[in-house]
Amino acid sequence: MRAFSDFGTPMLIGEGYRTFPVLIYTQFISEVGGNSAFAIMAIIIALAIFLIQKHIANRYSFSMNLLHPIEPKKTTKGKIAAIYATVYGIIFISVLPQIYLIYTSFLKTSGMVSVKGYSPNSYKLAFNRMGSAIFNTIRIPLIALVLVVLFATFISYLAVRKRNLFTNLIDSLSMVPYIVPGTVLGIAFISSFNTGLFGSGFLMITGTAFILIMSLSVRRLPYTIRSSVASLQQIAPSIEEAAESLGSSRLNTFAKITTPMMLSGIISGAILSWVTMISKLSTSILLYNVKTRTMTVAIYTEVLRGNYGVAAALSTILTVWSIIYQKESMMSSGKLVTMPKLADRMWVLVKAISLSPFFSLIIQQIGLKIKKR
């Protein structure tokens, strides 16, 4: 589903190969019509793939009999070496573009042309020219994340503890944004709120930061819902029943007992939602304006201009942030083995170096706003 709905990759390196998201975007921008028809076709195909996958998953289930567990067999050194070579080879090929991206960000540039030597000038230009985009990449997804956590916690509780036809419908509808391409969702938001809700003039939010916040919240809600549902399913209802039998209200039980116990699932889903919010382009490219553009939009526009140094610097910053948040998510869910002291200290140093420009940028932005006032 992620590959089907991806916009940035085929748009930048797809050349003559157009995918559904790219086709929908070009049709919408050119105003020749047809984008709605292509959007409906994309939704039908995505929904069909999702239903087929769900049918196969429900039909075929596998379990292991504890009475006859699988016995491990010794593998020859040649097979072990082949497995390691294959796995690490795939990882190296996957990471190689990122390594070259970091290398490109430190190349010395003269205008838009790379020259001999190395320099951090691309990063200076990125912070000077794209400071607002970097600030928006934190500010807008952070507000959206608060909404995602609130709605995901509430919906997951209804889906697990209050199961009925209505809550099942809400749970199913909350997964729709996951299968819908981002360009389709962006066009839907523009069509719905360009002249207000149903053309009434109420909620004319197209071109504002609020429509970006809404789109990011709706688009990334399924990640946190599924993580929260999985966490809540591991909590016995008898714990809540015991609290209520001792005089605690349902709201108090939910706030002080249930929510803290499912906090690890909420945090894991929230960080995953955050990483996808700051790194996705498909919805933002349709809904942004000059004041609300994010780093992904800035990277896209810099690549189109041929300014690869600044684009590489912004991409490197975004990559480091994504790795940090993803690692924190794995640590919070207990999926990551504790690192040695030296590696842990190095990790703290990497976080400090990567986040320090962001905090200085926030102070700079606040100072500029105070001066304007």
What label would you give each PLM region?
Residues 4, 10-47, 76-79, 108-132, ...:
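Interhelical loop and adjacent transmembrane-helix boundary motif
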Residues 1-5, 85-98, 176, 180, ...:
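Transmembrane alpha-helices
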Residues 75-86, 154-189:
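Cytoplasmic-entry segments and transmembrane alpha-helices of multi-pass inner-membrane transporters
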Residues 83, 88, 129-141, 179, ...:
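Loop-to-helix entry region at the N-terminal start of transmembrane alpha-helices
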Residues 41-56, 128-159, 166-169, 250:
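Transmembrane alpha-helix signature in integral membrane proteins
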Residues 10-15, 68-73, 107, 111-120, ...:
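Membrane-interfacial helix termini and adjacent extracytoplasmic/periplasmic loops
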Residues 80, 163-169, 211, 225, ...:
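Amphipathic cytosolic juxtamembrane alpha-helices at the membrane-cytosol interface
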Residues 36-77, 157-159, 229-240, 244, ...:
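C-terminal transmembrane helix and the adjacent membrane-cytosol boundary/short C-terminal tail
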